[in-house]
């Protein structure tokens, strides 16, 4: 038997219907579903529960299957179509199936997938349920509870035709529907079930089961004063659908649920006895407690297949149960604080009692404020010469060679270095000029800067000293005037010395730049990486530094004639001749340039010492005055303390 695919096409768009809506009781193609259930157009229709049509039922089996399997499959489809007709013709259900049907997911009742369709709930409490439904947790493809069959007699009004058993303790025991009789044309055995369900059996049992169903219906009508609310309970069936259609319907679903289910049409040969026993138990009208126990067993079993109708006493009680289960949904745990990589900042306490009682956002804010304060403290200012340079505190990165943090203890750990060696690298930030042009340019800039500093000090120094000496502003003013005039005289001298020193540096490093570019001298240090020597504080220190520089440059200039060619041979092993001639050129050029550089640097260092001598003398005098004043204050404090005390002779007693 083959179904006519043309009967399954949408008349409006001429496309295959792939979606079924329980609330609308209709089939839709992808475009129709977008128009009907768009969240922007109609908020209520967007809450309708919809499922993908079972493509295995629509398309049919492959032609390569055996004849026995084809016959079995044809019988299944015929049985499906009969059930569809019975559902449609049943007067107890009505034209719209969903109005009297409660839809449930195969998940547990406390699962976020436990959801009701909006049209199946009373209008006065509709909003309470829909507000608590998490729209981000829609039913996923694997959790889709719908199985759709096709009515070949009427292609325009297809109905939901097959469901599975799932009963919760909150619902009474399910009873077989009078509209769903056993099919007389099928020999398919149903899968084993622990609760009463309509099954496919042989022709000899079909008539007795129909009579039992009719008797059961009469008993239910006589026992209830109000009309029974018939509900259809669905359980999951694996749905086969296109990926784009799944995205359209289930775009907000959780796609990582690994729940597997067997097909509705997986039957075992040994299930006849169990199914007959279950039907007999149902026909004998067991008490409600036994029925509830059977419902519990059904909810945990994996048996699938069959259609059930359950009668409920009051709809409001079940709605309250749904609300409670939605409210009791477990909340996800709070996110822990993110781990921060190792840095020079304080580590966050992991097991602190104080942190446990604080909110995670507040804790993160506290740590961020502490880190910002530490970053501000790491920025340190140091004055060198006339201007000041800002550089990163070398002690902020207290790491040893292995990458670990250094401790604050006095003893040096393994792999650590003395802090004095680190600090010495930052006493001066200026690097030597690598050639003569750079030396002249930097020297000219330094000369102009010192002149500007000296002239501005005439005005700035009196103001600064008045602010610093609030107790005696007159004294501070004249002190500032003296410093300003002294700076105006010494700053140009200091600028001239800086120009000479920079020029000497560039001249000394020119040969290395021209021939090699690596700026390495005999000691193995890079001239460009050498830190500038500290300034001479007085004239004698300037003369001493200048003499040392002159002697060093004379020595390097003379010995370089021999040592530079040897170095060229060692460095350039691939082309020793090239290295040799480079060394010869570097040595000859250094023999002329380096002594000249030493003479210029000696003059510059001497001028630097002369310029700094007045400041050194003034600072020494101020320090002596401060020391005397501090000593006098200490003596006065001791005298005042001694006057308040009385001497007691211990021998007087």
From Swiss-Prot:
Keyword Metal-binding: yes
Family: Belongs to the VPS13 family.
Keywords recorded for this protein, A-Z: Membrane, Metal-binding, Zinc, Zinc-finger
Composition bias type Acidic residues, residue spans: 266-277, 366-381
Regions of compositional bias (Low complexity) in chain numbering: 195-213, 278-293
PROSITE patterns in UniProt: ZF_BBOX
Cellular component, GO, one term: membrane
Binding of Zn(2+), residues: 10, 13, 32, 37
Region (Disordered): 159-232, 248-420, 627-653
The name this protein goes by in its record: Intermembrane lipid transfer protein vps13l
GO molecular function per UniProt: zinc ion binding
Subcellular location: Membrane
Membrane topology: Peripheral membrane protein
Function summary: Mediates the transfer of lipids between membranes at organelle contact sites.
Biased composition annotated in UniProt, kind: Basic and acidic residues: 314-330
InterPro entries associated with the record: VPS13, Znf_B-box
B box-type Zn finger ranges: 5-49
